[in-house]
Design a protein with these regions (language model features):
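Gly/Pro- and small hydrophobic-enriched strand-loop and loop-to-helix capping segments
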Residues: 18-28
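C-terminal structured domains
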Residues: 10-14, 27-94, 98-99
């Protein structure tokens, strides 16, 4: 499951419902004989940082490093005990798979607790909707500053989440 799929648990938890879905745009469902042929293997995945404010994950290199140089890191940084690895100067060698995993869980857990503290389902949906809108605004600021994020780091998933929440509100009468 990718990072965006993990973060999808936020709108789902807002209403204790599985009315939301987020996929890989059917690219993993396409059958290809090449998937079954012997290969030499792939490379290690590129290191990522889960951004609560963006509700996505960013590449450590070049995205976190560049956003830090542009003084935009505070706007995308999650509250995490592992931030000392990315600031004041990024040390990507210390950002191990274990730390990345623990950081990801920490961010998701913090967001879930914050959302659950909102009380009613309507308040939870308002909260998560506001978080998504703020994330979209932060993406807009990054784009206006002339920095293009990797397609997997971008905010294209946010509009789908807003539409799903809106549809759910309509169907549930919330």
């Amino acid at each position: 499951m990718g990072n965006k799929q993990h973060l999808l648990s936020l709108p789902m938890a807002a209403v204790s419902n599985a009315n939301f879905a987020c996929g890989w745009y059917n690219n993993l469902k396409a059958f290809s004989e090449m998937n079954f042929r012997t290969s030499t293997g792939g490379r290690r995945p590129r290191k990522r940082y889960t951004s609560g404010p963006l509700m996505s994950s960013l590449l450590l290199l070049p995205e976190i490093a560049t956003l830090n140089k542009m003084d935009l890191l505070p706007q995308v940084e999650s509250e995490s005990p592992f931030n000392n690895i990315i600031r004041p100067i990024l040390n990507d060698a210390e950002w191990t798979d274990e730390i990345s995993c623990l950081h990801n869980w920490h961010v998701i857990n913090s967001l879930l607790k914050e959302m659950e503290s909102q009380g009613s389902y309507a308040n939870r949906l308002d909260y998560i909707t506001n978080r998504i809108v703020r994330a979209s605004e932060t993406y807009r600021i990054i784009n206006e500053r002339g920095f293009q994020l990797d397609a997997k780091s971008g905010g294209s998933h946010l509009n789908a989440w807003l539409a799903a929440i809106s549809d759910f509100r309509t169907q549930a009468g919330i």
